[in-house]
Amino acid sequence: MTVTTSSPATAEGRTPGIGRVARVIGPVVDVEFAPDELPEIYQALEVDRTIGGETLTLTLEVAQHIGDNTVRAISMQQTDGLVRGAVVRDTGAPISVPVGDATKGHVFNVLGTPLDVDKVDAETRWSIHRQAPAFDQLESKTEMFTTGIKVIDLLAPYVRGGKIGLFGGAGVGKTVIIQEMIRRVAKEFGGVSVFAGVGERTREGNDLFLEMTEAGVIEDTALVFGQMDEPPGTRLRVALGALTMAEYFRDVQKQDVLLFIDNIFRFTQAGSEVSTLLGRMPSAVGYQPTLADEMGVLQERITSTRGHSITSLQAIYVPADDLTDPAPATTFTHLDAQTVLDRSISDLGIYPAVSPLDSNSRILDARYLGQEHYDTAREVQRILQRYKDLQDIIAILGIDELSEEDKILVNRARRIQRFLSQPFFVAEQFTNIPGKFVPLDETIDSFKRLSQGDYDHLPEQAFFMCGGIEDAEKNAENL
């Protein structure tokens, strides 16, 4: 097995040392070493603990140097049963995870240990602490990432190698969009996906694994979980472990990668807990003073290099719906697009329940997409916004009280709203409707003609859950 993690300590020719536990306070462990054997920051340490006659090995990560002979480390597992004086081994390298094809179809923890099988035969392991790509290695051009999902491609297009925020409550279809994107990357583009469950409920992670297995997309996906009940050190590092696996697929195998992080807020929350445990003075609203730095270390590694990319879809929880909270506000500065799932749209049975008015993208601009795409998107949004403005009048007075022009616009908006729905491949077993991949040119042309009134004669129901405009015309013939 190849381990590509060279430690500064071993590079200097120094043999990794042996220390002893001096103090244990929850997940924080102080370890004493000889002054000339002090481990580097981020170095992994190992210590054995015995509970009920069973000996388990704990992994610690060095976070601080205290004096000349003591390090303060954060445990990646529960420290129950750990005692003062226990022997601690310096591994001579940071925490590493397996990388490569062997990781596909499996579930791992933060240490790279498989959770679904006993062993994974990976030839190479990479350190989870890596530098972001150098400036001269980055892809200089901005390129759209075509998903084949109409509402996203038209109104909130994704950036290849960009970062997308996915906002959505429970039951609005967030998991289905994640599964569909994984399937499309694998089947349409031959790419691979990596999923990071940060602070996930164990039940949710298990459900996702089983659903992905049933949908047939697990073979092209690696999953890394740090559950909600695990120490903050685990939840802080699990996203870096998943990102490291994604970087290998991008840099060595030259593949386009889709990286999911659910939930990025839990990453910030774990960092706040670790910061408090280390005795740092809290900053605004109690968050860690290093919040922007920690977020930047993660986000700057998610990017496009020459010809290949990591595109990230990040679920974001907004505390008390306060967008000015430091946690989401720090995340927003890194996002290239925002996909907002709206419960009122899902209540209408329209899926994906993406809000066409609340979702946005940095590249929704004629300079990146072309004038036709931009003009079509803005016209669709104008019609839908006018329809939204008229809904109170319709609810109180009825549609007959509107002007003839507004009546036409409302009927057109309802057709557009239904045409934004689309059958997904991973939902075929539930809907019995074959999934559709709609090319970008077809999406633009269909909505352009629809917004001009070319299809006002077709019934509304014909536009529901179809792919291209030809499907709507076929549906109209059958109604």
Swiss-Prot record:
SMART domains: AAA. It is found in: Cell membrane. The keyword Zinc does not apply. Pfam families: ATP-synt_ab, ATP-synt_ab_N, ATP-synt_VA_C. Its EC number is 7.1.2.2. Keywords: ATP synthesis, ATP-binding, Cell membrane, CF(1), Hydrogen ion transport, Ion transport, Membrane, Nucleotide-binding, Translocase, Transport. It is a peripheral membrane protein. GO terms for cellular component: plasma membrane; proton-transporting ATP synthase complex. CDD domains: ATP-synt_F1_beta_C, ATP-synt_F1_beta_N, F1-ATPase_beta_CD. ATP binds at residues 168-175. The keyword Translocase applies. It comes from the Bacteria. One of its GO terms (molecular function) is proton-transporting ATP synthase activity, rotational mechanism. Its main location: membrane. HAMAP family: ATP_synth_beta_bact. F-type ATPases have 2 components, CF(1) - the catalytic core - and CF(0) - the membrane proton channel. CF(1) has five subunits: alpha(3), beta(3), gamma(1), delta(1), epsilon(1). CF(0) has three main subunits: a(1), b(2) and c(9-12). The alpha and beta chains form an alternating ring which encloses part of the gamma chain. CF(1) is attached to CF(0) by a central stalk formed by the gamma and epsilon chains, while a peripheral stalk is formed by the delta and b chains. Belongs to the ATPase alpha/beta chains family. This is ATP synthase subunit beta. It comes from Frankia alni (strain DSM 45986 / CECT 9034 / ACN14a).
